[in-house]
């Protein structure tokens, strides 16, 4: 269990576990709640697209903040800005000013958080234990992803959006606390050769962004509609997927640390391709539940 000896990574994983509880209990309901709140299906996709455009436009500010402050303060700021989106989400009723505010805040929060979080985790982690540290994080994420959707679905059904998303915002805010005890990481003023070295990563991110629209956002909406727009049933389906993902993540991490990263990646893309095609053929509730659970396996890979 040497991979658990890095205190900084453990604190970061604790933060990410709390963050993931907010994501699975609130963020996973983002698109489907918009649909339920009177935003038409085409406009839901337009809202998601607007957030992505905002993220693209705001991304250069990461370098400004990162160079001035280091990574940790930017991750903390991103965590707090992300928390602000949930109360806004609860106020949306169709195409209104709250939807516009939601798109702006979500774009800012996601830009601040995700770019710096991944860099921060990579900087604090140990190269020789990378696979185990990532798989331990993902196992924790999968575990809270079992509880989060159940609580989110129950809260939206029985307490209403204000209370449910308010609770999610509180959890997201508290997720910043472990970061206060984590070390800061400075950003180099210049990085010669960085663009050339990142070409493959750039290509992977482009393809990842392309498939995410249908594989994640589109599927969430399809699943929600197949489940007759029930927040409780939708949350239960996500919880089932969390169980599968928790078991699959640990196996993958072991393969990576044994030097089989390329094999794991090949297997991941093969499973992903087959699974994506199967999703397009989904027409019944049992089939949707099974494929959604298997999707956690593909996601872990």
Give the positions of each predicted feature.
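Conserved MFS/SLC helix-loop-helix module at the cytosolic interface between two early adjacent transmembrane helices
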Residues: 57-93
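Hydrophobic core of transmembrane alpha-helices in multi-pass small-molecule transporters
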Residues: 17, 96-113, 206, 286-301
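Structural signature of the two symmetry-related core transmembrane helices
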Residues: 73-88, 166-169, 263-278
């Amino acid at each position: 269990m040497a991979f658990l000896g890095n205190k900084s990574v453990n604190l970061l994983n604790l933060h990410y576990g709390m963050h993931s509880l907010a994501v699975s209990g609130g963020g996973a309901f983002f698109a489907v709640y918009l649909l339920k709140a009177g935003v038409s299906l085409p406009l839901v996709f337009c809202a998601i697209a607007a957030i992505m455009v905002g993220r693209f436009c705001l991304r250069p500010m990461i370098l400004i903040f990162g160079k001035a402050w280091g990574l940790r303060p930017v991750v903390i700021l991103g965590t707090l800005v992300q928390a602000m989106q949930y109360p806004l989400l609860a106020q949306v009723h169709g195409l209104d000013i709250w939807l516009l505010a939601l798109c702006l805040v979500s774009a800012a929060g996601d830009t601040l958080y995700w770019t710096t979080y991944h860099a921060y985790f990579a900087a604090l982690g140990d190269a020789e234990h990378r696979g185990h540290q990532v798989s331990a994080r993902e196992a924790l994420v999968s575990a809270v992803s079992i509880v989060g959707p159940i609580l989110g679905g129950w809260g939206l059904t029985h307490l209403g959006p204000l209370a449910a998303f308010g609770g999610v915002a509180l959890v997201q805010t508290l997720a910043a606390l472990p970061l206060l005890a984590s070390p800061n990481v400075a950003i180099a003023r210049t990085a010669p050769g960085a663009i050339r070295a990142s070409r493959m990563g750039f290509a992977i991110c482009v393809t990842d962004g392309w498939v995410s629209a249908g594989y994640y956002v589109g599927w969430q909406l399809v699943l929600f509609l197949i489940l007759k727009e029930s927040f409780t049933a939708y949350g239960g389906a996500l919880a089932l997927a969390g169980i599968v993902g928790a078991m699959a993540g640990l196996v993958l991490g072991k393969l990576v640390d044994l030097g089989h990263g390329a094999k794991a990646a090949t297997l991941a893309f093969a499973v992903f391709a087959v699974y994506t095609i199967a999703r397009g053929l989904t027409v019944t509730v049992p089939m949707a539940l099974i494929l959604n659970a298997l999707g956690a396996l593909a996601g872990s890979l």
